[in-house]
Structure formats: structure tokens, C-alpha cells
Amino acid sequence: LPKTAWPPTWAAACPSARHHIHVEFYIIEDDKVGRLVREALAVKAREGVSVRLVYDDVGCWNVKNRFFKQMEAEGIQVAAFLPVRFPKFTSKVDFRNHRKIVVIDGIIGYVGGMNLAERYFYQVDKNQPVWRDTHVRIMGNAVGGLQRAFLSDWYVAAGQTITDQVYYPREEECRKIMACDREPYVSRNALIQIVTSIPTAPWPDIMQGMILALLRARQYCYLQSPYFMPTERMLFALQTAALAGVDVRLMIPERTDKRFLTWASRSFLHDVIRAGVR
């Protein structure tokens, strides 16, 4: 989605919600974007729609508590992910939730890298470059993967288990809603797999999935990431795919928000370019 269109597009999708709206972000700031979202959610909460919001406690450290209290006053259920309080310093400070998810009625989903803050949509500080990130809108059965991720985090943050079938609509209902959708789309028959991972998982699911996809690719594999610091196994998979004739393309920023990460990313480029990665 174009970054300038995403907030109103997301807000425009809220009125269509009939049963629930689930929102989860690492950063939600008390600025124009944050207040726009808060009002959109409050309208639906007043209509009786179940609205749940998870924010990361460390990601929102600079946000006054009253911002979220105002949400609760409007009927929005709010939970902080693994709060960290000082002077009691715990290991939870490094166990953060960077997911950026929106689920509407279990049928419409938004996922990507954009947090809820002005700087993600337009230039706030003339001395800082414009932030460029990606967020996508999906519909259909794949939204169930986002729903499971949110409800798992809701259990951790709010201590509430939610497993009702209403949060996972039947395929027929999804198709009915999709048939009436008028938003621009890339494909109505795309295959989407939602993969999640946590530090305590026995296996690195996301990395293993990417390596498997690279090694099974036959035509092309396109990757986009703000930082490029692959593990040895990931680097080997990229090189192997490119050397096997697969069209492997990597897109990274010329400059990131952290200078040392920019240089760290570039240190790996020679190894993949030498193998034929573009």
C-alpha cells in the first residue's frame, strides 16, 4: 500500500467491521496517526464491536499512559506486551514484540513493517530522511494466520484465551466478503503462508522457511529487508540458489536508520553478488 494512503485506507476498513477488530503494533505514538487510529477504533467500540489492542511496552516507552487509558475509556480493550518496570530490571526487556498486525472480522488483514507513527507516513523532521516501509492488505484464509498470531500474543499480554470459531470465518463467508471488495488487488488467487517465530521456540521457523524456499526455488526469489545480516546458512542458501540459475534479487536501503547496521549489511553484499545475486 502507498504509505500516504495507508492510514485512511486502514481507517476506512474499520467501519465495515461487524464483530471484532484486533490491532497489534510495536510502536503506537500519541500523534496525528495514533489519534486517527484511536478515534476509528473508538467509533466501532461504541457500536458494540469487540476491539482489542496490543502494544509493546518498550516500543511505547515514550507514550504517556493516558493515551491508552483514553482508549480503555472508549471501550477498547488494551494490553501491554510484557511490561518492564524499573528499578526492577528483568530479562523481559529484551523479549519484545515487533509484530504489526491488524485483523478485521477474521477476513481482512494488514501486516508489514509500518508502525503507527507520523514518521512512517510523511517527513516530520526536515533533517531526517523520509521513512520508507511496506505494509500489505490481505483477505481470505491467510488472515487466519495473523489471527492466531494476535490471539497468542493477547493470551500473553492479557491472560485471556480466545478460541471461538467466530474468529476464524468459514471459507464460504470469506469468499462472499471478498466478492464485494472494491479495493485494488494484486491477485485473487495468491498463495500466502503466515509464519511466526519466538525466541523460545525449539526451531527458527522463519529462517528455516526462507532457506527451504530458496533451495526449492526454480525460477525466481525476490527478497526485501531493511537490514541484511544473514546467518551462514542463509548466506549459503542465497548463493546456492543464484549459482543454480535462479533469479535471486535483493533489495536493501542505501541508508538505514542506524549507521552501523548500514555498514554491517554492506559487508555481506560482495559474497552474494559474486554468486550472481542481483
Language-model features: locations:
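Charged, low-complexity intrinsically disordered terminal segments
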Residues: 1-278
